[in-house]
Amino acid sequence: MPTINQLVRKSRKTVKAQSDSPALKNCPQRRGVCTVVKTTTPKKPNSALRKIARVRLTNGYEVSAYIPGVGHNLQEHSVVLIRGGRVKDLPGVRYHIVRGALDSAGVATRMQSRSKYGAKKPKQK
């Protein structure tokens, strides 16, 4: 506990909130180029092969981004759009790739939550 004199000499510092997605630099999305596309396994209670991509952003950062949905067409040198949003069971993956934007195709067979996966409305018969 500081004394009054100590507080007069040097006041308390306010704690600044840290960003959950620092590589975006306060932008809603960023464009980047895939350097590696691979699969990883999640943390302990879960088991799967999660698809991720290492992306070099236009501002020079290189981040890991999750590829949501079933199936994808991404490979090295694909240009993608990333947004914030971590994947809870993949340590170090703090970004999501936006499906249906730039080189990333939408999920073809998606019927529900289509806007989140860049899927077009199916033709009515």
From Swiss-Prot:
List the residue ranges of the region (Disordered). 1-26
Report the domain of life of the source organism.
Bacteria
Q: Does the keyword Ribosomal protein apply?
A: yes
Database matches in InterPro entries: NA-bd_OB-fold (IPR012340), Ribosomal_uS12 (IPR006032), Ribosomal_uS12_bac (IPR005679)
Ribonucleoprotein among keywords: yes
Q: Which residues carry this modification: 3-methylthioaspartic acid?
A: D89
Spell out the molecular function terms from Gene Ontology.
Answer: rRNA binding; structural constituent of ribosome; tRNA binding
Keywords assigned by UniProt, alphabetized: Methylation, Ribonucleoprotein, Ribosomal protein, RNA-binding, rRNA-binding, tRNA-binding
PANTHER family named in the record: 30S RIBOSOMAL PROTEIN S12 FAMILY MEMBER
NCBIfam families the UniProt entry points to: rpsL_bact
Q: What's this protein's function?
A: With S4 and S5 plays an important role in translational accuracy. Interacts with and stabilizes bases of the 16S rRNA that are involved in tRNA selection in the A site and with the mRNA backbone. Located at the interface of the 30S and 50S subunits, it traverses the body of the 30S subunit contacting proteins on the other side and probably holding the rRNA structure together. The combined cluster of proteins S8, S12 and S17 appears to hold together the shoulder and platform of the 30S subunit.
Description of how the protein assembles with itself and partners: Part of the 30S ribosomal subunit. Contacts proteins S8 and S17. May interact with IF1 in the 30S initiation complex.
Similarity section:
Belongs to the universal ribosomal protein uS12 family.
What name has this protein been given in UniProt? Small ribosomal subunit protein uS12
Q: Which species does the entry assign this protein to?
A: Clostridium tetani (strain Massachusetts / E88)
Top-down, what is the taxonomic lineage of the species of origin? Bacteria, Bacillati, Bacillota, Clostridia, Eubacteriales
